C-alpha cells in the first residue's frame, strides 16, 4: 500500500550498493517512539561491509540524504537512520486506500494458490464441551480467518474425538446404569455422570477396565450393538456442540473425526511395515525413536487395538492426498508437544517430504480459580454456561447504562461472546492462565468491549455527520500528531495480519486493535469532529470512517462482531 518504504529504500539504495532494494526495504522498521520518526533503517548489517561502527555509518547516511517529497526530515539515532514522512501524504495514502477497499482493507493475495488446513476445536464425543476447549476453538477460528484474508484456500476441520477406549467405558457404563430417555433429556451432563461413575467403580473393580477394552474391540470390529450405541452417543453430543458453535458463529468444512479413519489404519500399518519401521515391544507394535531422543511411538496395543498415533498418521496421509495442502496446522494444547514431535518424525521416516508442512500450534493450559479441570472427576465449567453468563452480565451492564436501549439481546450476545473471545486471544497463546469470571467479563481496560465500543463511537459520530463522507478532502488538515498516530496504526494493519500469520499468533491482531482504539480515542478526546468549519469536519470525518472500517475488519478477523450501537 505504502510508497514511503519504497521512497526510503530508493534513497538508501543510491548510497548502499551491497544490498538490493528489496533487502533494504525488508530491514526498514517502525521506531518504538513517534518522536524518533516514522521509519528507521538499522545499519548494524553494514558494519562489516563499510568497516565502520553502525552509528558512524548511520550519521554519514543521514547527512547525505536530502529531504524531499514524501520525506520531510532525516536524522541519526544510534545505529539507525530515522525518517520523518510528509503527514499530509500519509493521510492521503491511508484514507484513500481504506475508503476504496472497504471490507477488503487489510486483505492480500499473499497466499494465492496455496492451501492451508486448520484443525481446531475437536471436542471429545460424550464429554463436556468445557471452558478448556475455548482456546483451541477461538484460536483456530481466528487463524482460519487470518489465512483466508491473505488469499489462502483455507479448510476448517473439526477432528472430533469420536473413537477410542473411552467408548468401551461408556458402553459398559450405559449398559449397567444408563437410561435412554434420561440421556436424551440432557445428553452431555448425563453421559458425563456415567463416565465419572465408571471411573469411580473401576477403582474398586479393575475388571471393568477389561470389559471396556473388550467393548472397544467389538466397536473396532463392527459389532452392531456397539456401533449403534456409538452413533447415538455421537449424534446426541453433536446437538450440544452445535449450540456452542452457533453462539460463537463458527462453522467447519469437515467433521471427519477419529472414527472416519478407522478403515484407513491398516494401510498405515502396511506402509510402516514396508519401510521396516515397526518393532515388537511387549506384544505392542512401535516405531523406535530413540535415535531422535524420543520415547517409542506406539502404533498398536498388545490386544491389536489402535491408538491416537495410528489414527493421526492415517489422517495426515489422507489429508495430503485429498487436499494437497501447503500447510496443515493443528491447534492443540502444548501438553501434547511430545505426541506431535513423535508423529511428525514418523511421517518423515515414512519418506514423506511434506512432514515439514505439518505445524503444531500449541497453547497454554486453562485452570479454574479453584483448581485444574478434570473430566474424570466431573469438575468442569461448561463452555455454553460461560458464554451465556457473559451474555447475561453484558445485558445487565447495557440496561444499567441505558434502560431504553434497543436490540439489547442481540448486542448483549455480540459483546458478551466477544468479551470471552477477545480475552482468550489477547495474550500470547503459549501462556498458561487461570480462568476468572471477573477478569473475562470486565468492561474496563484492554478488553473486547472497549474495542467494540470504540467502533460504535465511530458509527455514532458518522450518523450525526450531516455531510457525505468521502476521500475528497484537504489532507493537510490531518497533518497534526493525533491524526498521524491514528493513521500510522491503520497503515500497519496488513503488516500485523501477516506477522500474526507467520507466527500463528492471533494476539498480534488484538494488540493492533487496542493500539488503534487507544489512538483514536485520544484523537476523539482532543479534536472536536463535528465543528462548524466544513473542511475540517470533512477531513476528520474521513479519518473516523477509516478508523471505523479498520476496526470492523479487525474484529471480524478474530470472529467478533462490530456493533454499530452499544
Swiss-Prot record:
EC number, UniProt record: 6.1.1.19
InterPro entries: aa-tRNA-synth_I_CS, Arg-tRNA-ligase, Arg-tRNA-synth_N, Arg-tRNA-synth_N_sf, ArgRS_core, DALR_anticod-bd, Rossmann-like_a/b/a_fold, tRNAsynth_Ia_anticodon-bd
Cystine connections: none
Subcellular location: Cytoplasm
Stretches that traverse the bilayer: none
Residue span of motif 'HIGH' region: 123-133
Cellular-component GO terms for this entry: cytoplasm
Gene3D superfamilies: Arginyl tRNA synthetase N-terminal domain, HUPs, Isoleucyl-tRNA Synthetase, Domain 1
Annotated keywords: Aminoacyl-tRNA synthetase, ATP-binding, Cytoplasm, Ligase, Nucleotide-binding, Protein biosynthesis
Gene Ontology terms for molecular function: arginine-tRNA ligase activity; ATP binding
Family the entry assigns: Belongs to the class-I aminoacyl-tRNA synthetase family.
Designated name of the protein: Arginine--tRNA ligase
Species this chain originates from: Clostridioides difficile (strain 630)
Upper lineage: Bacteria, Bacillati, Bacillota, Clostridia, Peptostreptococcales
Gene: argS
Amino acid at each position: 500500500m505504502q510508497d514511503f518504504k519504497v521512497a526510503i529504500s530508493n534513497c538508501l539504495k543510491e548510497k548502499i550498493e551491497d544490498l538490493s532494494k528489496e533487502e533494504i526495504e525488508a530491514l526498514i522498521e517502525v521506531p518504538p517512539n513517534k518522536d524518533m520518526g516514522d521509519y528507521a533503517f538499522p545499519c548494524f548489517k553494514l558494519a562489516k561491509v563499510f568497516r565502520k561502527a553502525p552509528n558512524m555509518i548511520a550519521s554519514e547516511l543521514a547527512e547525505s540524504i536530502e529531504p524531499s517529497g514524501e520525506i520531510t526530515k532525516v536524522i541519526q539515532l544510534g545505529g539507525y537512520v530515522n525518517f520523518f514522512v510528509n503527514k499530509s501524504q500519509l493521510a492521503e495514502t491511508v484514507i484513500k486506500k481504506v475508503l476504496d477497499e472497504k471490507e477488503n482493507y487489510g486483505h492480500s493475495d499473499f497466499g494465492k494458490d496455496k492451501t492451508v488446513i486448520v484443525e481446531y476445536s475437536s471436542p471429545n464425543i460424550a464429554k463436556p464441551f468445557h471452558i478448556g476447549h475455548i482456546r483451541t476453538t477461538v484460536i483456530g477460528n481466528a487463524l482460519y480467518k487470518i489465512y483466508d484474508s491473505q488469499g489462502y484456500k483455507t479448510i476448517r476441520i473439526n477432528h472430533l474425538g469420536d473413537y477410542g477406549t473411552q467408548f468401551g467405558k461408556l458402553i459398559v457404563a450405559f449398559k449397567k446404569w444408563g437410561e435412554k430417555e434420561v440421556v436424551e433429556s440432557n445428553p452431555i451432563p448425563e453421559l458425563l455422570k456415567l463416565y465419572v461413575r465408571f471411573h469411580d467403580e473401576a477403582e474398586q473393580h479393575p475388571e471393568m477396565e477389561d470389559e471396556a477394552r473388550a467393548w472397544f474391540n467389538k466397536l473396532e470390529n463392527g459389532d452392531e450393538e456397539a456401533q449403534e450405541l456409538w452413533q447415538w452417543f455421537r449424534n446426541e453430543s453433536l446437538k450440544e456442540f452445535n449450540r456452542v458453535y452457533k453462539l460463537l458463529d463458527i462453522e467447519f468444512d469437515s467433521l471427519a473425526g477419529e472414527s472416519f479413519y478407522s478403515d484407513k489404519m491398516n494401510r498405515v500399518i502396511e506402509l510402516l511395515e514396508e519401510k521396516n519401521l515397526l518393532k515388537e515391544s511387549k506384544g505392542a507394535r512401535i516405531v523406535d525413536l530413540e535415535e531422535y531422543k524420543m520415547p517409542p511411538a506406539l502404533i498398536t496395543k498388545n490386544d491389536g487395538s489402535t491408538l491416537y498415533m495410528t489414527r493421526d498418521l492415517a489422517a495426515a496421509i489422507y489429508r495430503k492426498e485429498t487436499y494437497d495442502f501447503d500447510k496443515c496446522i493443528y491447534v492443540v494444547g502444548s501438553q501434547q508437544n511430545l505426541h506431535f514431535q513423535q508423529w511428525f518424525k514418523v511421517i518423515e521416516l515414512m519418506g514423506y517430504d511434506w512432514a515439514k508442512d505439518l505445524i503444531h500450534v500449541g497453547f497454554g493450559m486453562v485452570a479454574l480459580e479453584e483448581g485444574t479441570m478434570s473430566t474424570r472427576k466431573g469438575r468442569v465449567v461448561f463452555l455454553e454456561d460461560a458464554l451465556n453468563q457473559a451474555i447475561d452480565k453484558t445485558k445487565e451492564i447495557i440496561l444499567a447504562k441505558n434502560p431504553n436501549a434497543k436490540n439489547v439481546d442481540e448486542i448483549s450476545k455480540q459483546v458478551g461472546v466477544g468479551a470471552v473471545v477477545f480475552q482468550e486471544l489477547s495474550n500470547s497463546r503459549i501462556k498458561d492462565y487461570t480462568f476468572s469470571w471477573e477478569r473475562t467479563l470486565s468492561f474496563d481496560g484492554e478488553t473486547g468491549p472497549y474495542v467494540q465500543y470504540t467502533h460504535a463511537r465511530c458509527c455514532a459520530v458518522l450518523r450525526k455527520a450531516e455531510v457525505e463522507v468521502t476521500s475528497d478532502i484537504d489532507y493537510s488538515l490531518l497533518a497534526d500528531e493525533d491524526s498521524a498516530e491514528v493513521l500510522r496504526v491503520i497503515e500497519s494493519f496488513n503488516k500485523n495480519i501477516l506477522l500474526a500469520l507467520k507466527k500463528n499468533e492471533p494476539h498480534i491482531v488484538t494488540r493492533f486493535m487496542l493500539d488503534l482504539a487507544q489512538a483514536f480515542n485520544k484523537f476523539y478526546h482532543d479534536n472536536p469532529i463535528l465543528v462548524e468549519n466544513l473542511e475540517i469536519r470533512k477531513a476528520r470525518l474521513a479519518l473516523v470512517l477509516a478508523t471505523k472500517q479498520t476496526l470492523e475488519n479487525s474484529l471480524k478477523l478474530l470472529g467478533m462482531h462490530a456493533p454499530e450501537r452499544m
